From Swiss-Prot:
Source species of the chain: Buchnera aphidicola subsp. Schizaphis graminum (strain Sg)
NCBIfam families xrefs: PRK00230.1 (NF001273), pyrF (TIGR01740)
Stored Gene3D superfamilies: Aldolase class I
Protein's recorded name: Orotidine 5'-phosphate decarboxylase
Family of this protein: Belongs to the OMP decarboxylase family. Type 1 subfamily.
Catalytic reaction list: orotidine 5'-phosphate + H(+) = UMP + CO2
Gene Ontology terms describing biological process: 'de novo' pyrimidine nucleobase biosynthetic process; 'de novo' UMP biosynthetic process
Pathway membership, UniProt: Pyrimidine metabolism; UMP biosynthesis via de novo pathway; UMP from orotate: step 2/2
Active site: K68 (proton donor)
CDD domains the UniProt entry points to: OMP_decarboxylase_like (cd04725)
The keyword Heme appears for this protein: no
InterPro entries assigned to the protein according to its UniProt record, in alphabetical order: Aldolase_TIM, OMPdecase, OMPdecase_AS, OMPdecase_bac, OMPdeCOase_dom, RibuloseP-bd_barrel
Gene Ontology MF term list: orotidine-5'-phosphate decarboxylase activity
């Protein structure tokens, strides 16, 4: 691979967007756990459960468990604690769950010596402003993200998932310790799939994003390592 973590570029999280373990492991076996992070979302976690997380840990990978908890505070407290018990590196909750829910998630991690990074999802990248209006949110998408970013920071979370074009503004408000994770990363030649907020890897570097999440651009590629090298080279 061309890439090492010594490069001053966003770190790469590979989203394991598969429907079966065999396909997932075919890709995982090509990756260096000292360089790449892995994301398990609702699909793979529902299919394979916590045992798959532990298997990836045994291979040396840091795992981002992207389950986007969004429920009453007590439920999120217990779910967060259960997730942290797996020894994961990062965990997501929905910022729109509100202050009490976010505080409950943070509280659930207090007993852990090395808790996972707790990250708030501000908005799904499949949504546009008209989608917000349809559910009664009348402010702009940009302002909505800024409000939820502030709420998440105030509640002591470690960072947010947000569209890349908001990253610089959020970094200027909350500093480098507040991590920015951005999905929807595509080379200009890639399909957008169902993502509405797309940026290129080069833009991700310019926007000071900490972690980029790359899924179907890699998982649907006939040569995922070649594609990863192209992405990495475009950020150097």
């Amino acid at each position: 691979m061309l890439y090492t973590n010594n490069y001053n570029i966003p770190k790469i999280i590979i989203a394991l967007d598969f429907y079966n373990k065999k396909e997932a492991m075919t890709l995982v076996d090509l990756l260096d756990p000292s360089v790449f992070y892995l994301k398990i979302g609702k699909e793979m976690f529902t299919i394979l459960g916590f045992k798959f997380v532990k298997e990836l840990h045994k291979l040396g990978f840091n795992v981002f468990l992207d389950l986007k908890f969004h429920d009453i505070p007590n439920t999120v407290f217990n779910a967060t604690k259960a997730a942290a018990d797996l020894g994961i590196w990062m965990l997501s909750v929905h910022a729109s769950g509100g202050k009490n829910m976010l505080l409950s998630a943070k509280k659930a991690l207090k007993s852990f010596k090395k808790p996972p990074l707790l990250i708030a999802v501000t908005m799904l990248t499949s949504l546009k402003e008209k989608d917000l209006k349809e559910i009664g949110i009348k402010i702009s998408l940009k302002d909505y993200i800024l409000i939820l970013s502030k709420l998440s920071n105030d509640c002591g979370l470690d960072g947010i998932v947000c569209p890349g074009n908001q990253a610089k503004k959020i970094k200027s408000l909350y500093g480098d310790k507040y991590k920015i994770i951005t999905p929807g990363i595509r080379l200009s030649s890639d399909s957008s799939f169902d993502q509405k907020h797309i940026i290129t890897p080069k833009e991700a570097k310019e926007f000071q994003i900490d972690y980029i999440v790359i899924g179907r651009s890699i998982t649907t590629s006939k040569n995922p390592i070649k594609k990863l090298n192209l992405i990495i080279e475009s950020m150097r």
